[in-house]
From Swiss-Prot:
Transmembrane segments: none annotated. Catalyzes the stereoinversion of LL-2,6-diaminopimelate (L,L-DAP) to meso-diaminopimelate (meso-DAP), a precursor of L-lysine and an essential component of the bacterial peptidoglycan. This is Diaminopimelate epimerase. It catalyses: (2S,6S)-2,6-diaminopimelate = meso-2,6-diaminopimelate. GO terms for biological process: lysine biosynthetic process via diaminopimelate. The record marks H159, E208 as: Could be important to modulate the pK values of the two catalytic cysteine residues. Belongs to the diaminopimelate epimerase family. It comes from Escherichia coli O81 (strain ED1a). The gene is dapF. The record marks Y268 as: Important for dimerization.
Length: 274
């Protein structure tokens, strides 16, 4: 099986063309491939499939290292767009894809960045899903014998965003896994730790559902900005500084889609016998 290794701000992916190759990924195979010592190693596996709708270009599937399938990955979406152009699967700059959650448009810019229409953030608790009676800008949760104030949103996947004074000293490794599997998140959640530097600039670390802390989480950056705007903390255009680098997020508010712009890097191509 041929594959490519790619990354978006250090969030790394194994990308496989299932348009021209006949491949099947069981959870066991994904876990084996994800092993950084015995396999290929990655944060997530991205699979390019033929579209289910003639109006679309591709179907986009995402798997975590534990073999579970997820509906959204912003950094992966940028790598997906670069991959299909690099491999000659399309020459379009505007690429329309379906995911387990819906549809997305990926745009490759003139300077080889990728702009992703992430859709409109959804704050309805049932959409996240999150156990709450109504939409609130801030929820109060109990976790690890602490009272946590957080914002909750779906970007096609569940996100919880906590404001911290300094991301360098935030309890990502201890509080992250506790909140990820908190009973109020029946499908678990991605946990963002957000430091507001100013209205146009935040620093962010994300403990990802099924993957742990990563160098960057695209949908997590989108979620943090959406929550920050909802809470009146941020402007419509925000620079997000992650451990792996920078993303630019723009959202005009309710009724509008949110846009993420950032890099996608091809590292190498490989072949593995399954």
């Amino acid at each position: 099986m041929q594959f490519s290794k790619m990354h978006g701000l250090g969030n790394d992916f194994m990308v496989v063309d299932a348009v021209t190759q006949n491949v099947f990924f069981s959870p066991e195979l994904i876990r084996r491939l994800a092993d950084r010592h015995l396999g290929v190693g990655f944060d997530q596996l991205l699979v390019v499939e033929p579209p289910y709708d003639p109006e679309l270009d591709f179907h986009y599937r995402i798997f975590n290292t534990d073999g579970s399938e997820v509906a959204q990955c912003g950094n992966g979406a940028r790598c997906f767009a670069r991959f299909v152009r690099l491999k000659g699967l399309t020459n379009k700059r505007d690429i329309r894809v379906s995911t387990a959650n819906g549809r997305m448009v990926l745009t490759v810019t003139d300077d080889d960045l990728v702009r992703v229409n992430m859709g409109e953030p959804n704050f309805e608790p049932s959409a996240v899903p999150f156990r709450a009676n109504k939409v609130e800008k801030t929820y109060i949760m109990r976790a690890a014998e602490q009272t946590i104030l957080c914002g909750v949103v779906s970007m096609g996947n569940p996100h919880c965003v906590i404001q911290v004074d300094d991301v360098d000293t935030a309890a990502v490794e201890t509080l992250g896994p506790v909140l990820e599997s908190h009973e109020r998140f029946p499908e678990r959640a991605n946990i963002g730790f957000m430091q507001v530097v100013k209205r146009e600039h935040i620093r962010l670390r994300v403990y990802e559902r099924g993957a742990g802390e990563t160098q960057a989480c695209g949908s997590g950056a989108c979620a943090a900005v959406a929550v920050g705007i909802q809470q009146g903390l941020l402007a419509e255009e925000v620079r997000v500084e992650l451990p792996g680098g920078r993303l630019d997020i723009a959202w005009k508010g309710p009724g509008h889609p949110l846009y993420m712009t950032g890099p996608a890097v091809h590292v190498y191509d490989g072949f593995i016998h399954l």
